[in-house]
């Protein structure tokens, strides 16, 4: 029987401490691959804790791929590669970092792209009555206008000299410090402010990254996937290749066969499929990157909206526990947590790329205003951001739960399947319909429903898209609870 010493848990909850202890035992090998774990009830009885605590810890391990379950058999440890949990023993040297005084002075990432197939849709009902399942905007009541205005007034009053001074290329130190601290708390990432680069939108940061790593590299993109990086690379003359995926994400064999040098992935919650990359595939991906001068661009967009369990460990953090020089560039944005119009995104560079960024790209001016950076820094440092995020998560969880309830209670409940609902602000709704996808699109248009289809997110050489047929990408970020009954009624009638 597994024994855990809870006297060492400090301020961790029982669930989190149990999860971490079991995870460490798996990584250390004391819980070997394919070993059966105790039942929830027996482990709870042995440790003197509740069954629900064990259940939640097991579920988190399943979500991250450390454990798998078999019906009527129980829980088992996933077969993993050897993976160190120790801190790296070597120090990272990256040259001298310029001081603050020495530094010289596309639309933001939207969940849904304006492809021709969707932008040409003309609803048969009035625009006022259209239910939009593609919009990336937020409702007014979800933005903290009073707090934001108050902080901005303080910035204007107290930071006049900072506002009028030239911006360093990587952004103001105050915001980079706030982001580094936030990542340490929320994502368990060990980040220094010098590693953080701030920019107006992830698209801008992608363009910097392609210049930093080199336009001559061959980049790989998840297929299906977010379309903007492909458009940016095409505009910059950068070579890229679509990569097939399975239920665990990017297939490593694809990386080798297509001679990929750098790959863009979203392991926490892939868009648009909702796939969460399990730990075994993450280890394989990192092992691939360490075989040569290869890089992983980890887009953590939407990771804040995880509705079950704790936040998943980032590739950036996993990479930092090895003796690797650092193969992962981490990207994220405040688009979804605050508002797309704010246009503040950031990336975190491994140490060996920090000095290279200053030397090669330091001539760029930071594209986010001082006023917005200083306001956001205070918003984070004073604890407003954490409270705002909690409030927003509760709102979206309620909308999602309400929508799922109405869908599962509808007459069409036996004609669809849902996937990818536990993270992010969208899920997939696969329709079992005896009609072509184009016919279904027209029926939904006529019903006044604007919605994207999974097939729209396949890159040009997608191959077999049968699995994507008649699959709707349901983005509920702009959906109001009072619209849900009408939405489900319209869907039922259209089908």
Named regions from a protein language model:
Residues 1-153, 352, 362-369, 373, ...:
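N-terminal basic, amphipathic alpha-helical segments
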Residues 137-140, 270-272, 302-305, 363:
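Short histidine/acidic/glycine/proline-rich micro-motifs that form metal-
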Residues 152-292, 297, 304-305, 312-323, ...:
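Conserved core of the PLP fold type I
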Residues 179, 227-232, 260, 297, ...:
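A generic "structured core" feature
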Residues 197, 239-243, 329, 419, ...:
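General small-molecule cofactor/ligand-binding pocket signal
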Residues 233, 255, 326-328, 342, ...:
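Domain-scale detector for complete catalytic domains at protein termini or as standalone homologs
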Residues 324, 329-394:
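Conserved core segment of the aminotransferase class I/II
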């Amino acid at each position: 029987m597994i024994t855990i010493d809870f006297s060492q848990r400090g301020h961790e909850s029982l669930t989190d401490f149990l999860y971490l202890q079991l995870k460490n035992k798996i990584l250390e090998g004391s819980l070997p691959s394919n070993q059966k774990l105790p039942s929830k009830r027996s482990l709870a009885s042995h440790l003197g804790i509740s069954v629900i605590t064990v259940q939640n810890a097991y579920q988190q391990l399943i979500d991250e791929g450390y454990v798998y379950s078999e019906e009527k058999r129980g829980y088992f440890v996933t077969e993993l590669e050897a993976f160190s949990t120790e801190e790296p023993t070597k120090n990272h040297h990256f040259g001298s970092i310029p001081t603050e005084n020495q530094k010289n002075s596309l639309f933001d990432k939207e969940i849904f792209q304006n492809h021709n197939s969707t932008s040409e849709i003309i609803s048969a009902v009035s625009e006022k009555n259209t239910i939009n399942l593609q919009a990336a905007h937020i409702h007014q009541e979800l933005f903290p206008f009073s707090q934001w205005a108050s902080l901005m007034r303080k910035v204007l009053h107290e930071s006049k000299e900072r506002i009028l001074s030239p911006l360093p290329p990587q952004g103001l130190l105050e915001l980079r410090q706030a982001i580094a601290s936030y990542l340490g708390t929320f994502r368990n990432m060990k980040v220094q402010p010098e590693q953080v680069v701030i920019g107006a939108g992830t698209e801008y940061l992608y363009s910097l990254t392609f210049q930093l790593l080199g336009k001559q590299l061959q980049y790989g993109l998840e297929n299906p996937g977010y379309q903007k990086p492909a458009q940016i690379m095409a505009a910059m003359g950068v070579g890229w290749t679509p990569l097939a995926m399975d239920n665990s994400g990017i297939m490593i064999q694809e990386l080798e066969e297509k001679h990929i040098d750098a790959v863009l992935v979203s392991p926490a919650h892939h868009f648009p499929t909702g796939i969460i990359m399990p730990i075994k595939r993450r280890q394989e991906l990192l092992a691939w990157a360490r075989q040569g001068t290869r890089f992983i661009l980890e887009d953590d967009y939407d990771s804040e909206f995880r509705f079950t369990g704790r936040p998943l460990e980032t590739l950036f953090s996993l990479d930092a526990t090895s003796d690797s020089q650092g193969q992962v560039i981490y990207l994220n944005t405040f688009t979804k947590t605050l508002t797309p119009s704010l246009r503040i995104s950031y990336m975190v560079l491994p140490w060996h790329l920090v000095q290279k960024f200053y030397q090669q790209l330091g001539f760029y001016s930071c594209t986010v205003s001082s006023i917005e950076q200083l306001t956001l820094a205070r918003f984070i440092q004073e604890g407003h951001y954490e409270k705002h995020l909690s409030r927003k998560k509760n709102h979206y969880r309620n909308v999602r739960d309400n929508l799922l309830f109405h869908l599962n209670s509808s007459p069409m409940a036996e004609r669809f399947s849902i996937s990818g609902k536990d993270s992010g602000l969208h899920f997939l709704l696969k329709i079992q319909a005896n009609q072509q996808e184009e016919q279904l699109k027209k029926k939904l248009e006529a019903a006044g429903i604007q919605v994207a289809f999974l097939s729209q997110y396949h890159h040009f050489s997608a191959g077999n898209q049968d699995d994507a047929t008649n699959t709707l990408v349901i983005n509920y970020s702009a959906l109001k609870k009072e619209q849900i009954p009408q939405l489900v009624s319209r869907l039922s009638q259209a089908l």
